[in-house]
Swiss-Prot record:
HAMAP family, per the entry: UPF0354 (MF_01548)
InterPro entries according to UniProt: DUF1444
Cystine pairs: none
Annotated Pfam families: DUF1444 (PF07285)
Name this protein carries in UniProt: UPF0354 protein BPUM_2629
Stated family: Belongs to the UPF0354 family.
Domain of life: Bacteria
Length: 270
């Protein structure tokens, strides 16, 4: 299969995202494609290289997924102003990388907390097939505090269904949390899950959240386990629609420490 260029991908997405009310802008220097609603001025900016990497593995599925994501997001943006009061059960925390924007496309500061050296915690209002990140304007309008958002989201993430698959590779066990509800990585914030697995871990407990739709807990019982976890993390990171970090974390006594996975060696903390 020939490698797709950013321009080719942009053209393919344009052909699938045809709407008289939408404009498309391809930025060759930044390798991005922006799809914007002409009436609202709001839109989505797609970073093309990660999509190409995923397309090389799953061509049709990747394009279908991106098109669906853009349509749902633009539809949500065009809808009526979202309210959080009365929708407390629809508020969840979402993990993003520290490079994720701190403000919306309108320049309104998003509500977030620092988490680790690699990650931040943002807060989302679930809208069914999509969600909206909560911003400072929404809090002020409804007289909510950041603490209230944090507590509500923390409570809700503990109520999410847990779907786990375990694989054993070279004497190491890997637990994959994939409920495919958009909040798999958020389960990292459920302390009861971490404590439960900390009790059953026989070796070193390591954690990975390469993108928003996967959360991995590893029971590393020998040095090859670190290499395997590193390879898994990089693979998932490259294929995720919303990548977070390719680095893993050591979990010890309730604390997360980002680590480098070095080939054929034990991890080194940053």
């Amino acid at each position: 299969m020939a490698k797709m260029t950013s321009r080719q991908l942009a053209n393919e997405l344009k052909s699938r995202l045809t709407n008289d009310n939408w404009s498309h802008q391809f930025d060759r220097e930044k390798d991005t494609l922006r799809i914007e609603d002409k009436q609202t001025g709001k839109g989505i900016t797609l970073e093309l290289p990660p999509i190409i990497a995923k397309w090389e593995v799953k061509p049709d599925e990747t394009l279908d997924e991106i098109v669906y994501y853009v349509k749902e997001a633009l539809s949500a943006m065009k809808g009526e102003a979202q309210h959080i009061s009365g929708k407390e059960k629809q508020i969840y925390p979402v993990i993003r990388s520290t490079s994720f924007p701190e403000a919306s496309s309108d320049g309104i500061p998003l509500v977030f907390d620092e988490h680790t050296a690699e990650t931040r915690i943002y807060y989302a209002l679930d809208l069914g097939s999509t969600y909206r990140l909560i911003d400072e304007k929404m809090l002020q309008k409804e007289n909510w505090t950041k603490e209230r958002i944090r507590e509500t989201a923390s409570f809700n993430v503990r109520s999410l269904e847990t779907v786990v698959k375990m694989d054993e590779v070279a004497g190491n066990r890997f637990y994959f949390f994939r409920a495919n509800d958009g909040y798999d990585a958020s389960r990292l914030l459920n302390e009861s899950i971490l404590q439960e697995y900390a009790q059953k871990i026989e070796g070193q407990m390591a954690i990975s959240v390469p993108h928003q739709d996967v959360f991995i807990i590893a029971d590393v019982c020998n040095e090859s386990g670190y290499d395997i976890l590193g390879q898994m993390s990089m693979s998932f990171f490259a294929s995720g629609t919303v990548p977070i970090t390719a680095l893993s974390f050591l979990y010890d006594e309730g604390k997360l420490e980002p680590i480098f996975i070095l080939a054929k060696s034990r991890p080194k903390q940053q």
